[in-house]
């Protein structure tokens, strides 16, 4: 009986191994390019409703909580400002200060010089309560914290969607990286929406912030814009109140203009304070009244900043609604182009 030589056996074994490898590769390619198909429109729609929509709902809820936290933090910050008012009123109503302010205010009304006395009061206010620079920095710090929360929520949403796609055998033969494409596409749409927001400057500024997320320039721009609107709102309220405070406040706002929008708000406070002192200089309850009026002014400033339609919180709320509206089709588009 004829036997196969060892070299022949080795060659045959190698041929069989090569054949098996080739067959495996062919089967693999056949499966993924032939019998393996991408999800149908119906399958994709079902997946989106059952797996993606709950994730988007959770993201909306998390963003709402982040905005509520920002609102609470702003309130807490203004509570700190209000807590410092008694020190300021005790300082400003001391005999020397009260006499100086009253005398300078009378001269101001007669001469039209509306700066000197407000500067004195502004210095006292900034020393005891809050400076224009510190107020702006405080608001920017809080807003940056909000941006970090929104960014964390966005990243969590994308990771959860990626995991859902990976776990669903009908969706894709490979995992996807939404974060690689989402930021560019969603930010492009947000920026475009901001350009098309027309005269809604508050919404446009808020959308630009959400598109850049915590970029220092965007944060500063939004805070300054919000403080400008706050100052304008306060000026309207004060002017409607009448009295010496209203007369002097018109000039008081100009004292802080060099320090930006927060300086404008502090300048308005100074004008009000001078007016209250002049109107009540002979009253033995001046300090108590001034304490009440200063606290009320800060409360109105907080309300304007957070509750007005174009205030910081309300404009961010509208921007979040718009962002949530456009991110759904962006994600759906990424699912449509899955292999």
Sequence positions of predicted segments:
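N-terminal intrinsically disordered, acidic low-complexity segments at the extreme N-terminus
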Residues: 1-2
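N-terminal Sec-pathway targeting helices
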Residues: 5-22
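Amphipathic, membrane-inserting segments
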Residues: 19-22, 26-29, 60, 64-65, ...
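An N-terminally focused, membrane-permeabilizing/fusogenic/translocator signature enriched
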Residues: 19-136
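Membrane-engaging insertion elements
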Residues: 43-57, 117-126, 130, 223-243, ...
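Extended, amphipathic alpha-helical coiled-coil scaffold segments used for oligomerization/tethering
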Residues: 86-196
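Pore-lining and gate-forming transmembrane alpha-helices of multi-pass membrane transport proteins
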Residues: 200, 204, 208, 212, ...
